[in-house]
């Protein structure tokens, strides 16, 4: 608002993570038309990491990355994912038990559950190309239910993506409200196409 700008475009607004490389920066290859990109996580708005050594490590990395003349897309996104994993281990159980999360989950489950399962399997098998996965490579309701069962080992990784999307949803809502209060509109882009190896 101070620079007289009225529209701020964010690309990619949707998650495009397939390879964890710079090629994921292409905004028109989203893996979900609903999931927000983890690159938008604002750590200043999150709880502090309790482990002092880890907190110091991430602060040093933040300063190093912010001092670069150009954004290092891969390192920034990988650092943000690692930071979110630390916070999930620290805060995740309480967050997922909260009434705010439950309300978010009830509204978003139709896309959040398959997205989170896809992300967990992508990491497990090291590729977004689900046709090459040894299992879960075809839609199967029984397999989906097993991945969503909190008593299974797979659920912990699936729930991490629930946590990340909840955090991003809340932060984006706050950023949107702040921008609107200053007369600025946040603009994404309509994902008319999705990555052929995406969750959707």
Predicted regions and their residues:
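Acidic/aromatic-lined carbohydrate-recognition and catalytic surfaces
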Residues: 1-200
